Design a protein with these regions (language model features):
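Detector for the mature cores of small, proteolytically processed
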Residues: 29-66
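N-terminal acidic leader/helix
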Residues: 1-27
Length: 66
């Protein structure tokens, strides 16, 4: 993933959390044979992930999902 794409995706996650008044209180990095991503959680529930592969920059879950 290019650095600019990474920063734009990270900003999108942060902006959506701010808009919806969601506090991201945990960030985990997953890197194994299947996942290469950064997961963002609020109160123990995953609300977004930032995919570090070519498949797509980010996904939203739960309270951050449309």
């Amino acid at each position: 993933m290019e650095f600019e794409v990474f920063i734009n995706a990270l900003n999108e996650i942060v902006d959506r959390a701010k808009e919806r008044d969601v506090e991201i209180d945990e960030v985990d990095i997953l890197a194994d044979n299947y996942y290469n991503c950064i997961q963002f959680s609020s109160k123990g529930i995953i609300v977004a992930d930032l995919d570090l592969t070519e498949s797509g920059p980010y996904n939203f879950y739960g309270v951050l999902r449309d």
